[in-house]
């Protein structure tokens, strides 16, 4: 069968690539065409547009690039119609993907599957109407979404397990590199504890968050701070910021290896918070925004949830500290990081991580999703 996938950022590229691999196992004749990235391209098929040309986040970046975004949407719709896939699989990225789903429902007979559903439980809950109307099947990766979609909105979904949990478990099972070897390979001091910096996957996130993280690094000489480079972001972009902190090192393509040896982490909100928890690395969640006081106020008034990090959302309580908008300050980050380097607060966070891991379960998400997708497609023929 023919599968058209759309992923608009680095995390979507990762999860979609694993789904593609599982789909090939379930359907050896699978053909792929996609908006995505290098990891999806490695699975075969045709890369139509790289996510680097799609990944705009926040009101002002989206407004500035609106013409490009609309042009990409039009191109995507035309390409799908011309290729005529058996199914279109949307991977997160709701601003773009829900528009594609609306078009496909209105103009074609192509079924739409959503893998990694829009987080409408956080905000824009009204989008449930669009999802109910335009999405044929929804495959959830967060256990609490079952209650939200099925319990609150009476919209049946499939919880397939969490792909991040599957990926981390697989990596930890097979990874054997010693700390000394990792440090030697990356020019790090083997005897100095590592604090990992995960500053986001988009340029705007990095620009907003990394400078303050580096200020904190300059104040903690007993630790070595190591920045995990995101896929699709070139070294020169990071080095513009790192010039202010000569003690910080950059590693690329080794985020899981870095987390395997990290003592603690500063993490920009997103999938990375969950990855860090599953590696049992105590963390502070940091997220800077435009107009922080305004955003801090609106967050309390607009968001439908108490937390922004997946760790706290899955646990349904505060396991990790979230420094967002008006609470994102150098002083707060330094204090909260110091608090989890040793002692009871650190141990309490690690206990919370175990609760999160149990809630996610041990299903292999891409395998489970691929099996269901192929089964559903065959039953509809």
Task: Please describe what each predicted stretch is.
Residues 1-381:
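Nucleotide-activated sugar donor-binding and catalytic core shared by glycosyltransferases
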């Amino acid at each position: 069968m023919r599968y058209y996938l759309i992923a608009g950022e680095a995390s979507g590229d990762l999860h979609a690539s694993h789904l593609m691999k599982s789909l090939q196992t379930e359907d050896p004749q699978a053909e792929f065409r996609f908006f995505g990235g290098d990891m999806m391209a490695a699975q075969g098929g045709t890369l139509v547009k790289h996510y680097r040309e799609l990944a705009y986040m926040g009101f002002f970046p989206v407004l500035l690039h609106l013409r490009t975004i609309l042009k990409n949407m039009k191109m995507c719709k035309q390409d799908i119609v011309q290729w005529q896939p058996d199914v279109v699989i949307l991977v997160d990225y709701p601003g773009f993907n829900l528009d594609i789903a609306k078009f496909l429902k209105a103009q074609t007979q192509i079924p739409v599957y959503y893998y990694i559903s829009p987080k409408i439980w956080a905000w824009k809950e009204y989008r449930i109407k669009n999802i109910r109307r335009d999405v044929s099947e929804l495959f959830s990766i967060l256990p609490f979404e079952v209650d939200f979609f099925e319990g609150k909105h009476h919209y049946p979904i499939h919880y397939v397990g969490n792909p991040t949990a599957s990926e981390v478990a697989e990596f930890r099972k097979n990874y054997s590199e010693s700390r000394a070897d990792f440090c030697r390979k990356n020019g790090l001091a083997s005897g100095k504890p590592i604090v990992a910096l995960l500053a986001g996957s988009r340029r705007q996130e990095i620009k907003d968050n990394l400078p303050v993280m580096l200020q904190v690094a300059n104040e903690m000489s007993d630790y070595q701070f190591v920045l995990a480079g995101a896929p699709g972001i070139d070294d020169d972009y990071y080095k513009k910021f790192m010039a202010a902190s000569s003690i910080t090192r950059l590693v690329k393509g080794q985020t899981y290896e870095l987390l395997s040896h990290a003592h603690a982490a500063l993490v920009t909100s997103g999938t990375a918070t969950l990855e860090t928890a599953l590696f049992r690395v105590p963390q502070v969640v940091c997220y800077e925004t435009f107009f922080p006081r305004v955003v801090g106020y609106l967050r309390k008034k607009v968001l439908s949830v108490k937390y922004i990090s997946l760790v706290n959302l899955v646990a349904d309580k505060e396991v990790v500290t979230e420094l967002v908008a008006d609470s994102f300050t150098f002083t707060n980050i330094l204090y909260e990081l110091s608090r989890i380097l040793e002692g009871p607060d650190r141990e309490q966070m690690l206990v919370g991580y175990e609760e999160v891991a149990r809630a996610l379960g041990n299903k292999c998400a891409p395998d489970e999703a691929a099996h269901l997708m192929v089964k559903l497609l065959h039953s509809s023929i």
